[in-house]
C-alpha cells in the first residue's frame, strides 16, 4: 500500500477514533506495574497523576488491538518534559517506547499507534526539566494485538522498507507534524499466514527527528509499536529542514530530509 493511501487511512481512522478517546477509562490497580515500576522509572515511588501537567487519551475498547491510538498531551503553560516512557502493563514487552524530547515540543502533543495484547493499563511517565516525574494513563480493553496477523508477510512486507513521509500543518502558533515509516515492525509473536511459520521479531528500534540541528524527538521502541509506525508531534517551527534517522533490529539505517514547510 503506498504511503499516500496509508495517510488517507490514518486520517479516516483518526476521525473515527475521536469520540472514543474521550471515554472515562482511568487507570486501574495493576500488580504488573507494581512489580516493574522500579525497573522502568528508577524508583518505587508512584508518580502523581496530574492532568494539569500531563494527560493520556486512549479508547476504552480498541477497535483493532494491533492499531490502538494513544495521544499524550499537556495544557498550555505546563512544565516542559525532557523524557517520556510509554508503558503497556500487560504486554509481553511492557515498555512500548521511551522518548527524549526537545524544547520545541513543549507543551507536548504526541500521538502514536500501539499494539495492546490484553486488557491493560496504558500509562505515560514523564520526567520534567526539574527532575520531577508525573504520570497519566487509561485502561484499555483489547486482546491479541501483539500476535495479530501482519498486513503483509515475507518479502512483500519489506517492499519499500524504510520509506518515510513527513507532513506538517499549522496549528495556531505551532505546527503538527506527522511522520510515517514503512516497516512491518514484526513483534516475534506473529505467524506467516501462508506458511504458518513464526515470524522473527524485526522492528524499528530508534527514530531521531531534528529541526535543523535541534532535537525534536528521539524514540527507542520495541515490539509494541504498530506496523508502519506513525508519530504525530506538535512543535514550534523555525523554518529549518526536518531530518529523520531511523534504525531497525536488522541494523538497517534509514534517512530522510524534508523542507521546513513540511512538504
Language-model segment annotations:
Residues 25-31, 143-168, 263:
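Low-complexity, Pro/Ser/Thr- and charge-rich linker/hinge segments at domain boundaries
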Residues 57, 69-76, 176-184, 192-197:
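Short edge beta-strand/loop segments characteristic of extracellular beta-sandwich folds
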Residues 65, 117-121, 174, 239-241:
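Extracellular Ig-like/FN3 beta-sandwich strand-entry sites
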Residues 83-87, 206-210, 245:
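Beta-strand signatures of extracellular beta-sandwich domains
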Residues 102-111, 223-234:
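Aromatic sugar-binding surface patches on proteins
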Residues 134-140, 252-263:
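Edge beta-strands of extracellular beta-sandwich domains
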Amino acid at each position: 500500500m503506498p504511503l499516500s493511501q496509508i495517510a488517507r487511512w490514518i486520517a479516516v481512522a483518526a476521525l473515527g477514533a475521536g469520540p472514543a478517546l474521550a471515554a472515562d477509562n482511568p487507570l486501574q490497580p495493576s500488580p504488573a506495574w507494581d512489580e516493574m515500576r522500579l525497573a522502568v522509572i528508577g524508583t518505587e515511588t508512584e508518580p502523581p497523576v496530574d492532568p494539569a501537567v500531563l494527560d493520556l487519551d486512549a479508547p476504552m475498547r480498541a477497535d483493532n488491538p494491533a492499531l490502538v491510538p494513544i495521544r499524550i498531551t499537556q495544557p498550555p503553560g505546563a512544565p516542559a518534559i525532557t523524557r517520556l516512557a510509554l508503558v503497556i502493563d500487560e504486554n509481553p514487552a511492557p515498555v512500548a517506547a521511551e522518548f527524549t524530547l526537545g524544547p520545541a515540543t513543549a507543551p507536548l502533543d504526541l500521538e502514536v499507534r500501539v499494539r495492546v495484547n490484553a486488557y491493560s493499563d496504558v500509562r505515560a511517565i514523564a520526567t520534567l526539566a526539574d527532575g520531577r516525574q508525573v504520570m497519566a494513563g487509561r485502561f484499555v480493553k483489547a486482546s491479541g494485538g501483539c500476535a495479530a496477523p501482519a498486513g503483509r508477510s515475507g518479502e512483500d512486507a519489506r517492499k519499500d522498507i524504510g520509506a518515510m513521509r513527513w507532513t506538517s500543518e499549522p496549528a495556531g502558533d505551532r505546527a503538527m507534524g506527522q511522520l510515517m515509516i514503512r516497516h512491518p515492525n514484526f513483534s516475534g509473536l506473529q505467524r506467516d499466514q501462508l506458511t504458518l511459520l513464526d515470524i522473527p521479531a524485526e522492528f524499528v528500534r530508534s527514530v531521531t527527528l531534528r529541526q535543523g540541528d535541534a532535537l525534536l524527538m528521539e524514540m527507542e521502541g520495541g515490539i509494541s509499536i504498530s506496523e508502519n509506525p506513525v508519530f504525530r508531534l506538535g512543535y514550534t517551527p523555525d523554518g529549518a529542514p526536518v531530518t529523520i534517522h531511523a534504525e531497525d533490529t536488522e541494523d538497517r539505517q534509514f534517512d530522510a530530509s524534508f523542507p521546513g514547510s513540511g512538504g
